[in-house]
Amino acid sequence: MKSVCGVLIILVVLTTMLSISTFSTVGAEADCPISEAIKCVEKCNQKVEVCEPGVCKCSG
């Protein structure tokens, strides 16, 4: 049972790291909160040009 918990923790950590790196590659600024970045990515279909608190601009 402990090994299952360990695998789940590793998966959560890897998923979090991947999502953070994905947000940085779609143009989300460092000062853009994760919640705001998620909204921008959904709104712009992952084509985010500018992401700041309260500001979300899509590219193309």
Swiss-Prot record:
UniProt signal peptide: 1-28
One Gene Ontology cellular component: extracellular region
Primary location group: secreted
Disulfide bonds: 32-51, 40-56, 44-58
Domain of life where this protein originates: Eukaryota
Tissue specificity note: Expressed by the venom gland.
One term of GO molecular function: ion channel regulator activity
Lipid metabolism listed as a keyword: no
Biological role stated in the UniProt entry: Weakly inhibits the Kv1.3/KCNA3 channel (1 uM of thetoxin inhibits currents by 13.2%) and Kv7.1/KCNQ1 channel (10 uM of the toxin inhibits currents by 27.7%).
Domain notes: Has the structural arrangement of an alpha-helix connected to antiparallel beta-sheets by disulfide bonds (CS-alpha/beta).
Similarity section: Belongs to the short scorpion toxin superfamily. Potassium channel inhibitor family. Alpha-KTx 29 subfamily.
Protein name: Potassium channel toxin alpha-KTx 29.3
The organism of origin for this protein: Lychas mucronatus
Classification of source organism: Eukaryota, Metazoa, Ecdysozoa, Arthropoda, Chelicerata
